[in-house]
Amino acid sequence: MSRKTVSRTFSSFSISVVAVAVASTFSAHAGKFNPKFLEDVQGVGQHVDLTMFEKGQEQQLPGIYRVSVYVNEQRMETRTLEFKEATEAQRKAMGESLVPCLSRTQLAEMGVRVESFPALNLVSAEACVPFDEIIPLASSHFDFSEQKLVLSFPQAAMHQVARGTVPESLWDEGIPALLLDYSFSGSNSEYDSTGSSSSYVDDNGTVHHDDGKDTLKSDSYYLNLRSGLNLGAWRLRNYSTWSHSGGKAQWDNIGTSLSRAIIPFKAQLTMGDTATAGDIFDSVQMRGAMLASDEEMLPDSQRGFAPIVRGIAKSNAEVSIEQNGYVIYRTYVQPGAFEINDLYPTANSGDLTVIIKEADGSEQRFI
């Protein structure tokens, strides 16, 4: 009885050792598939290269994929992109097997400041560029299971969109319209004048008496007229007045002007009767043409003066700006150099303290 028990125990132990050894051997070698199985029966089929799939489970074939594009954690759009096999250097730097084929035009559409990197201009606008090698700390990650491409660029390499900005593509010139703004006032008055009384006899012997009272009437009218015409981007304006007094009428044309917005310059072009701005010196009436900046085209954060803050983040970081102990600005930046140029102008005095809080919890402070 004792022998059987010992024998069973020994047998079970032997099987376990063999099973572990087999499992260890299986996991230590990469799986291979004989491509001969994919050829036809007569052996004349094309040779199939499966070495791509022997590099790991994350390996995917290069090709064209429709993906959702995220730039610095912000979803941009869904588009069809070509993906190429990553080079050995790209595999080591980003751990990616596929990298997107992005042209200079596509990078510009995503907000990258391509003009700041001369190497990007050495190739044609539609050719693939190794942006991760040209732009420091730029990277890409392709999530194949979710068909999502995540691109990361240093904040300083991106065009900054100031807070409150409305894209110019959404600006509207308005509808054609005829405008009329008027103000009218008038008065009627009557009064009696008293003179000396008199009497006289006419040829018929009738006696007439004059009590010396006369009734006087006075009418006065005034019209202030501001009219205009909107047609496309053009604005026609006229300012005129009309007055009537003492039986006489007078029409005065004070001024007529034609203006339109010049969007690339964020300015207004005015021709005709106009006046200079009176912000610093007295306003001067003039007749001619004037091109002047229009702050209404700028977001609130771009009106007035505010300093530009520059720094370098070591990781995905939170950047806060304090003044007199109060946080007046906070944003999040990618690794690399960053630039903050959309601070709201403030009338308060005091130094600005910049606090960079890294992903590991460490902080940098500078004034």
UniProtKB/Swiss-Prot annotation:
The keyword Phosphoprotein does not apply. The keyword Membrane applies. Induction: Induced during the exponential growth phase. InterPro entries: Fimb_usher, Fimbrial_membr_usher_CS, PapC_N, PapC_N_sf. GO terms for cellular component: cell outer membrane. Keywords: Cell outer membrane, Fimbrium biogenesis, Membrane, Signal, Transmembrane, Transport. One of its GO terms (biological process) is pilus assembly. Pfam families: PapC_N, Usher. GO terms for molecular function: fimbrial usher porin activity. It is a multi-pass membrane protein. It is found in: Cell outer membrane. SUPFAM superfamilies: FimD N-terminal domain-like. Its main location: membrane. PANTHER family: FIMBRIAL USHER DOMAIN-CONTAINING PROTEIN YDET-RELATED (PTHR30451:SF21), OUTER MEMBRANE USHER PROTEIN (PTHR30451). This is Probable outer membrane usher protein LpfC. It comes from Escherichia coli O157:H7. The lineage of its organism: Bacteria, Pseudomonadati, Pseudomonadota, Gammaproteobacteria, Enterobacterales. The gene is lpfC.
